[in-house]
Each structure stands twice: as C-alpha cells, then as structure tokens.
Amino acid sequence: WPIRYADLEPWYSYVEKFVGICGDRDGIENLPDSEVMPGFALNCVEKHIQEANHRRYQLQRRVIIGRCAHLTQPQDIHLQQGRGQCQNRTLCERGCPYGGYFSSVSSTIPWANKTGNLTLIPNAVVHSIIYDDTLGKATGVRVIDALTNQSTEYHAKIIFVNAATLNTNLILLNSTSGRFPKGLGNDHDILGHYIAFHNYRGNVSAIHEDYKDQYYYGRRPTQVFIPSFRNVFKKETDFQGGYMSYYVAYRPGWHKGYGRQGIGE
C-alpha cells in the first residue's frame, strides 16, 4: 500500500474511541493494540488452555480474549450517542436496544443525523459506481428503487463502499466504464476471485475432566482466540496466508443428551 501504518494509526484510534472497543492491549506485532475498554474474562478452562499454550509455544502463538465493539465501560462519547453498557445477554443478532454494541443503527446514523446534513433513502439498491473517464475518478453511485425499479444517480466527492464481502465485489464488477470494462479496479481480473469466509466446519471439540469444582456465571459476547501465526513474518508453508482460531470452554447443559445414542429408545 502507498501508505504506512503510522499514517493510519491516529485514524484507527479516532474510530476505535468513537466505536468503543473492549479487549486487552496484548502487544502482538501483527495485531496492533487498540484503544480499548476492559475486556471480558476467561473462565478457568480457557485460562488453563491459555497457560498450556504459552508454555508450549511461548510468544509464538498467543491466546487472548477477543476484541469486540461492545461497551464494557461507556465513555462520554458513547453516552452522547445514546448508547449504554453491554448487558452480556448475547442476543446481539436481534439488535441491541441498549446500543451496547456498535452498529450504524445505534451509533453512526443517529450521530450523522444530528448534523442536519444526513439524507436517508429507503429501498435503494446500489447497482454500480459511476466512473468518469475524463476526470479519472469515481463521481457517484447508481441505485435502483426496490419497489419501482426506477434508476437514480447520486453524485458525491467521496464514496464509501461498505457492502461486505460478496456485494462489494458485485458492485465493483457492475461498475464498468471505458477505463474499467471488466469492473472498477479490475485490471487483473481478480475481482470475484479468492473470496474467503470463516471455516465454520473446521472445528474440533474435547471434554476436559478437571475443574468440576468450579463454575462460571454470566454470558459473554466474544470468544478467546489465537491471532494468525502462520506465514506472518516469513513463508513457512507452500501456501499464502495463515489461520486465526477461536475457541470457547463451557459446561454443557441437559440438552447435551440430544446427540447421544439411547435417547428416545
């Protein structure tokens, strides 16, 4: 990239303070420290795994609590947004009525609305980005009304493409012009290729026989994880990239019997 991390760091800090990140300052070179509020705690089995891992691999494979955009200790900037502390309900996917985790609904849209300069356009499906061949830059977006199929163009000095993995690729592929006949920025036919997702099926589980005299209480919206450790500073395998692994330890409830033989016989 034509910019350094040092150029981005103050802006990372600015955004992280506004968003509200919880976690620890772990001092991991390939996972720079964030501006954090207190992180969530590990339970006894997770701490056991952490200690065993660090004994085996020292600092090569760090086990840390996941950093997440949940308010464990709201600051004034978050209270100004109308947000409250995370209640640890782990019902985040329903949308948090307390604004405990960062989202456009709880934070940036209300904040932008305070300026008086925000216009929200409902039912607008982005079709493509408008590229001006003469100016040599993007100048707007083309949207389609989901109800009427009417196409409208909106122009701006700055355009943010925040459509997640698949739709960002699709929008860029749709954004053809004389300069980019195969899609905006797609000079090398890379758009739409090499898209990666979390490997949700790549998991292992085990039963730990100890710590039966201990228990943990409450919930937690994040997990423990091991940041990427393969091919970080040197190539160690015959492929590029590495792994970032998450794990959690818990005491199973009565529903564990669902998957056991003999139930219902």
Predicted regions and their residues:
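Glycine-rich loop(s) and the adjacent beta-strand/alpha-helix scaffold that form part
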Residues: 98, 115, 124, 128-132, ...
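Short, low-complexity, polar/charged sequence segments that are solvent-exposed and flexible
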Residues: 22, 82-87, 140-142, 146, ...
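A short, glycine/Asx- and small/polar-enriched loop/turn
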Residues: 79-80, 132-139
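Conserved redox-cofactor binding core of oxidoreductases
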Residues: 1-126
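Sequence-level motif detector for i,i+2 pairs with an aromatic at +2
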Residues: 87, 136, 200-201
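Helix N-terminus capping/helix-initiation residues
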Residues: 43, 145, 232-234
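FAD cofactor-binding and catalytic pocket of flavoenzymes
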Residues: 1-2, 67, 188-265
